[in-house]
Amino acid sequence: MGGGGLKKRRIVSIAEFSIHPIGIGTSVGDYVKQALQAISKIEGLITRSLPMATILEAKNVHTILKAVEASHSALRSMGAKRISSILRIDERLDKPRMMKDKIESVRDC
């Protein structure tokens, strides 16, 4: 059997991502909308929007980083002169863990 079942199961990276254009005023909804539209075009990415961030789920960190770049590019194309983003990545390698699994594990406590 060697190698365990990890190769057969889906390994995922989960990230919490938020992006903030700076110097454009207090309303950023249009910018966030464009960033989310850009992210939605990334193949192999699952998203869940929350009030203060978006959760990204992908098979690898590379796909998550592509989403971050796409969102920055979208804001630059809208004329943003400065962009701040926060990215926190959970890349668990010992067992497969999707975002729904993490939520269910807390509910089961």
Regions found by a protein language model. Give the residues of each.
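Charge-rich, low-complexity N-terminal segments
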Residues: 2-109
